[in-house]
Structures are given as C-alpha cells and as structure tokens.
Swiss-Prot record:
Family of the protein in this entry: Belongs to the energy-coupling factor EcfT family.
Function (record text): Transmembrane (T) component of an energy-coupling factor (ECF) ABC-transporter complex. Unlike classic ABC transporters this ECF transporter provides the energy necessary to transport a number of different substrates.
Any Gene Ontology CC annotation: plasma membrane
GO molecular function: transmembrane transporter activity
Keywords noted in UniProt: Cell membrane, Membrane, Transmembrane, Transmembrane helix, Transport
Cellular localisation: Cell membrane
The name this protein goes by in its record: Energy-coupling factor transporter transmembrane protein EcfT
Quaternary structure, from the entry: Forms a stable energy-coupling factor (ECF) transporter complex composed of 2 membrane-embedded substrate-binding proteins (S component), 2 ATP-binding proteins (A component) and 2 transmembrane proteins (T component). May be able to interact with more than 1 S component at a time.
Transmembrane segments: 29-49, 63-83, 94-114, 117-137, 143-163, 243-263
Topology relative to the membrane: Multi-pass membrane protein
Length: 265
C-alpha cells in the first residue's frame, strides 16, 4: 500500500524539467490547476493531456510513478465519478433505476471530472518528482517573499510546507512497517466488527505518533547541529537563477490558457 504513495518523493535526474527554476515550476503547477477548470469539452481536455504528456515524457521519470500517484486517491475518484454519473440530470436517459438515472450528461460530467483529477495529480506529482526538497523550500520562500511586508515568517512557512510534504512518504513507509508488525502478531484490520477494527487501529496509531515525534526531534537536532537559526543570516550554497527555459515554460502555459479560452464551447 505504501509503495503506491508517490507524493512527496524526489527522483534525481538531469532532464530539462529537473533543471527548471523551482519558482517557475511551482508557479506553472498552481496556474495549471487553475486553468484545468477552463476545459469544458473533449478538444480542450485532449489539448491539456497532450501538454501534460509532453512534460511527463521529457522529464525522463518512469511513467509508472505517475500511475502510482493516482492509486492513493482511487476511491475518492471513483466515488466522485459515481456521484456525477448517477445524480446529474440532463441529456438522454440511458439507464432508469427509479431514483437513480444514468444519462449522457452524467457520463460526460463524470468522465470530465476524472480527467481533471488525472491532470492535477500528474502535474503535482511531476513537481515533487523533479524538485529536490531544498529547491522546493527556496522556491516557495521566493514566491512568498512579498508577504514579508506584513511580517509573515516566510522562510519558516516555506520550510514547514516543504518538510511536511517530504514527510508524507516517510510516514507512510513507517505505517507500512508497523502494519506488518501488527499483522505478524495476529491483529486483524480487515475482518470482524467495525468496533473491533477501530480498536485494532489504536496499536497502529500510538507507535506511529511516537515515531513521528522522534523523527521531528531528530530533524530539529540535526538542523541545530548544522547551525540553523531560521531565515535570518542564512546563506545558500546554490543560488536560484532565472533562465530562458523558465520563461519558455510559463509562456507555453500562457499559450495553453489562450487556446483553452478560444476552444471553450
């Protein structure tokens, strides 16, 4: 189960996407998530899938990683799809089950909702797979820099977001280990009464919380040992430099947005 958790993992590489400035990648992903909702016909969705597929293939990250990125939210996607299919009224009725009806409009809305999930997950997965934790932190800090004017602790906030994101796969791996250890002791998580299943989760949560606090403490000690004192006076080994390729990425996204507006039905 935990091997399916891809969000938060970084795959080292030397593709052009790995070399893109993290500020450009973060901005592009945020903008892409916003323009996903501009698509309202199959031509616009086909255009967006072509754009994402190009980025995925040129990132040189195995495509299987992106498929695995969908698996943790499979049930959420399925439930959303079924709600759209059965409760959307309009179009031609294909199946009439009394209170529930399957219509052509419901199927179309369900398929489009599925496409939106896939596009958003692929883009966010692409961001974390091609951006190292340090780059992600620096990129977020630069983007949030204007908020320093209102005395927002930008550096600490960016670091917190980056660490939280990177801790997701670590905690999931830890959960997998504890789960296997509990099963080896005869604990059943998938059978019996619901009350028994809930009680069985407690031996899983307690060591998980202890492990999370221990890892957080170890990380804090390691950062202090390296002289970390927050953003004040901090120097960087690698400085972010905006390049022509970064501008091209944002221009391509602007062109995509313009095409989506033009092709909207």
């Amino acid at each position: 189960m935990m091997e399916k958790m891809i969000l938060g993992r970084y795959i080292p590489g030397n593709s052009w996407l790995h070399r893109i400035d993290p500020r450009a990648k973060i901005t592009a992903v945020m903008a892409f998530i916003a323009i996903v909702f501009l698509a309202n016909n199959w031509l616009t969705y086909a255009l967006m899938f072509a754009y994402v597929l190009y980025l995925v293939l040129t990132s040189k990250v195995p495509f299987l990683f992106f498929i695995k990125g969908l698996q943790p939210i499979f049930w959420l996607i399925l439930i959303t799809l079924l709600l759209q299919v059965f409760f959307t009224k309009g179009g031609t009725v294909l199946v009439d089950l009394g209170l529930l009806q399957i219509t052509t409009l419901g199927l179309a809305n369900g398929a489009m909702m599925f496409c939106r999930f896939v596009l958003i997950i692929f883009m966010t997965t692409l961001l974390t797979l091609t951006t190292s934790p340090i780059e992600l932190t620096d990129g977020l800090e630069k983007i949030l820099a204007p908020f320093r004017l209102v005395h927002l602790p930008v550096h600490e906030l960016a670091l917190m977001l980056s660490i939280s994101l990177r801790f997701i796969p670590t905690l999931m791996d830890e959960t997998e280990k504890i789960l296997k250890a509990q099963k080896a002791r005869g604990v059943e998580f998938t059978s019996g009464k619901w009350s028994d299943r809930i009680k069985a989760i407690i031996p899983l949560l307690v060591p998980l919380f202890i492990s999370a606090f221990k890892r957080a403490e170890d990380l804090a000690i390691a950062m202090e040992a390296r002289g970390y004192r927050g953003g004040k006076g901090r120097t960087r080994f690698r400085l972010l430099r905006w390049r022509f390729a970064d501008t091209c990425l944002l221009i391509s996204l602007a062109v995509l947005s313009g095409l989506l507006f033009w092709l909207r039905s």
